[in-house]
Each structure stands twice: as C-alpha cells, then as structure tokens.
C-alpha cells in the first residue's frame, strides 16, 4: 500500500518495512516521500498518525479490529486524550524548527537522582540544544509541585509517583502531567541511626520513626512494602513522616528519627558524618526500580513541542553519558558544588561509582548502586498505582493501564533514546519481582488483594 494511506481506516494494513527498498525502515521512507510531495504538511501529518497507531497497536490486526468497533472519529478522540497528536503533527512539520521558549526554569531537589537534569547545565547539554535553562535548587517536593503547578517552573525533577498523583488529583488539584523520562533507577537506601546497629532485623523496628521524602514517593511505597513483608503494619507499628532530603541527616543527628528510606547522597552523607549506617540498598528490595522523573505538564508539552523535544533530548543525551561508569567521577565533580548538591565530591563519588563505606566498617563495591535508564515503563506506573491503592491514597476504580499510558510517555522516550545512541526496549510493559514476589501489570487488582496488610477493603 501507499505509505500515506489513512491509518485510521480499518480497511488499511500498515506494513512494517520500506516499500521502495531504498530506506532502512518505513519511517525514513515516509519522511523522504513527504519531502518530495506537493503537500508535505498534510502528508507529514499522515506520517505522524501512522507512527502513533503503530506504537499503540504493534499488531496491526488489533488496530483494525479496534477501528471497526469504534470508528475513526471515536478513535481519534480517544487517542487525543492521552497523546498530543496535534502537537506531534506540528513538531513534525517544523522539524528542527524554532524553539518556542528558549529561556526555561527547571526545578530540582539536590539529590543524585537528578543527575541528568543537573549535569545538563554545567556540562553544556542544554546549551547545545539551543536552550538557556536555569536549574533551580528547591527545598522540598511540595514546593517543587506547587511551583510547577503555578507555572513558576516550566518543568521539574519530580519523584516518579508525583505526575501520576497530580494527574489524578491526589494531594493537589488534578492537572494532566507527563513523565517522558525516568531520571534514575536504584540509588536509594534504608539508613538507620548508629545507635541501632545491633537492630538489623526489621521486626525489631516496632515504634521506630522513619522519614521519607514525600507521601507520593517510591521511598514511601518501598518502605511500607518492606516492613509489611516483615510483619509490621506501616501505619500502626512504625511512624512515617515526610521530611525534605536536605533536612534528613540533621533530623537523624538530633534523634528526631530512627532512620530513613532516602535518596542519595543523603544516605552516604549520614555515613560521612558518622551519624548513620546503610542498612540496605533499595536495589535489594527491587532491582531496577524507578525513583525520580523528568516531568512537565501536558499543557507545556502541547504548547511548546519544539522546546519540549529539545529539553528532553538534552536530558536523554546526558543520561546516556551518565550510564557509562567511566564518566561517573567527572559527573560527581560537576554536580557536587554548592549551587547543585552542595556535598563533598567524595560523598557524591561514592554514590555514583558504587564503591562506598557503609558506616559499619566495611567498604562495599556495588557498581549499580545507582544507574540511569530513562525508559518510562508503563508497568512501573501501574505498580506505583497499586501501592497508592493499597495504602488508601487512591480511592475507587481506576483504569491502571490507561493512566500509565497517559502519564508515562514511552513513545517519546523510545524515539529520543535512539537519537541519543541508547537502545530502548521493544515493549512498554514487563513483569518484575519485588522482594521475590512477581508483579504482573496485567493483573493489578489481584496483586493488591494478595497482600495481608493493606488499607483497602
């Protein structure tokens, strides 16, 4: 068929290869043909439409059955709810067009999870993308959320559950938000006060006071999961309070808390200051778990498609650089200064290289203590939503897969990861295990029901 037949027609089959044999793939074929036709704008839109439909329906038979069932107009309306199709068409038409808003403010919390965002300023990634970005150090997550919602920040470093919570109106007014990139995986730890070094069994923690960075954080959900698996009810047997990361070590030193599940360099700084020890890395709870994310409102994405693409591309390229272990010391020097993390370089190096003192007299070598994989797996979002539901933050029925698709923009990540020289996965969901228990993203309600300790009926 012609590469430009209507992808919203149930009668059309979308092939997977280049028809003329002169291009490496169908997308290149389509783009080249669009440039050669008399109406490139209209045909360019068709390229975008086909790309979107192929991403949503990898099996063409499923696309055709869907269109026969609901019709093209209903399909267009449904897709527009979670994908800015008009903005994508405009961005394609403009190509590497004018950046709508070159001067930006992006908020961040001074933790190593924000490494790709922070390093993009001193190491020139934003500048090479044609952007003048002011990365603004911010005190805590509630402030990040409020400043972003009030449009004081154009985009922000957020905890990966936050865009989901904001979109659903949990803890704030509902505003559609997006996560086009995960900032880091792993990179957190449970740290206890030195006085508790003989209490390594979580069943001994009854009555402990713990800090987490925010109510809507992977830290809160992992701590709750961990203690519940050891028989403690996180709402009744321990106390969990939200404390901004820059204040955690001081609270541990002052004996206001017994420990925290926190991002780095907070854990390593507690060891450096001699007030705490690292009980365990969160990678040993869930290997490869997401933590923080690059987030922007859907309004920003729609109104500034070229700016959004340039910003995300810069962060993806920084992420690709950060994935290589040989670059970690250079990155540590770039992000340690006072205007960024405000930490001794040795503390940041221990986190990024994975060779670190644990506070118990040992030097551990864990190269993937923190890593950087930007792909926003839909299954990550679904797991987070199950924990929101499990602990009573999310009420009523929820279409887990729909929310995941709307917020975690896997299609955008795939394209820009390729441009940055990374290899994105071929699927958007996967099974994984948390403390040995498999999570199937296709069965979220059964997963919630399987837990003995929960706040749901």
Model-derived regions, located:
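Ligand-binding pocket segment of bilobal, Venus flytrap-like solute-binding proteins
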Residues: 153-155, 244-276, 297, 329, ...
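Glycine- and small hydrophobic-enriched segments that form the cores of compact globular domains
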Residues: 74-87, 92-94, 126, 154-158
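N-terminal secretory signal peptides and thylakoid transit peptides that target proteins
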Residues: 52-78
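Secondary-structure end/capping motifs
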Residues: 303-409
């Amino acid at each position: 068929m012609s590469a430009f037949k209507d992808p919203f027609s149930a009668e059309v089959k979308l092939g997977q290869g280049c028809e003329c044999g002169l291009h490496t793939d169908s997308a290149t074929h389509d783009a080249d043909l669009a440039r050669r036709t008399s109406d490139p704008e209209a045909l360019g839109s068709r390229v975008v439409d086909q790309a979107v439909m192929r991403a949503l329906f990898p099996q063409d038979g499923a696309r055709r059955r869907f269109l026969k069932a609901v019709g093209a107009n209903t399909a267009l309306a449904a897709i527009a709810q979670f994908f800015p199709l008009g903005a994508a068409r405009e961005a394609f038409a403009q190509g590497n067009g004018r950046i709508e808003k070159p001067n930006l403010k992006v908020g961040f919390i001074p933790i190593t999870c924000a490494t790709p965002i922070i390093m993009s300023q001193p190491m020139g990634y934003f500048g090479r993308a044609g952007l003048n970005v002011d990365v603004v150090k911010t005190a805590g997550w509630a402030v990040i959320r409020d400043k972003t919602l009030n449009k004081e920040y154009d985009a922000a470093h957020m905890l990966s559950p936050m865009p989901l919570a904001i979109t659903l109106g949990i803890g704030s007014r509902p505003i559609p938000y997006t996560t086009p990139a995960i900032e880091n995986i792993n990179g957190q730890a449970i740290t206890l006060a030195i006085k508790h070094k003989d209490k390594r069994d979580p069943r001994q923690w009854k009555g402990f006071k713990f800090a987490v960075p925010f109510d809507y954080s992977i830290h809160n959900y992992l701590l709750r999961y961990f203690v519940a698996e050891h028989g403690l009810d996180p709402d009744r047997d321990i106390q969990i309070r939200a404390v901004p990361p820059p204040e955690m070590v001081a609270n541990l030193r002052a004996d206001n808390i017994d420990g925290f599940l926190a991002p780095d360099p907070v854990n390593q700084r507690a060891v450096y200051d001699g007030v705490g020890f690292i009980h365990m890395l969160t990678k040993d709870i869930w290997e490869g778990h997401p933590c923080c994310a690059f987030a922007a409102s859907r309004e920003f994405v729609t109104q500034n498609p070229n700016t959004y693409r340039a910003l995300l591309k810069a962060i993806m390229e920084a992420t690709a650089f950060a994935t290589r272990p040989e670059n970690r010391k250079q990155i540590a020097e770039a992000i340690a200064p006072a205007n960024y993390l405000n930490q001794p370089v040795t503390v940041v190096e221990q986190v990024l290289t994975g060779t670190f003192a644990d506070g118990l007299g040992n030097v551990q070598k864990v190269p993937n203590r923190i890593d950087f994989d930007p792909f926003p797996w839909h299954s990550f979002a679904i797991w987070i939503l199950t924990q929101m539901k499990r602990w009573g933050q999310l009420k009523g029925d929820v279409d887990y897969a729909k929310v995941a698709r709307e917020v975690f923009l896997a299609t955008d990540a795939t394209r820009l990861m390729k441009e940055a020289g990374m290899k994105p996965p071929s699927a958007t969901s996967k099974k994984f295990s948390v403390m040995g228990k498999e999570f199937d993203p296709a069965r979220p309600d059964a997963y919630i029901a399987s837990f003995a300790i929960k706040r749901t009926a």
